[in-house]
């Protein structure tokens, strides 16, 4: 069993895919979950807790979350809703500070397609620009993006055009990540994350 440690930050279905992949890669996993989105289990949690905004405006990060980030070998952001699953975690001051100082490899997993109402029309470049604008101290060591057949279904454009990563200082890791249900395949994502953790080139 691996003794490596990972932290996954996000919420909703995207975080569930990451959490399904990570046990194949590391021996210890901490999930830092936002409930700011409006769907799935995190949305139900938010409704049950009657939470509509962050109070206080500058919340204090839990020591457990900060400690997990400090001890991590791998930190994974996404996939998931950019503004309601990924960014809320980064805006908590203690989390942002811990991420900036982390010794771990920090990875952003891009979505497979656009999201109506929140990210429609946003390219992968737009996602990375938004991360930089909202979390300027964040250091990304790698961006993981799907390269292969486009997701079927609702006809929304994909967000993972490899051309969006040309010229970026962050390492681009392209792989076929699509499962049979138009989501990220945990086994494929695990292989990519294991390669990043092990320092394998792309």
Language-model features: locations:
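Active-site gating loop/helix substructures
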Residues: 51-79
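C-terminal functional extensions of proteins
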Residues: 121-202
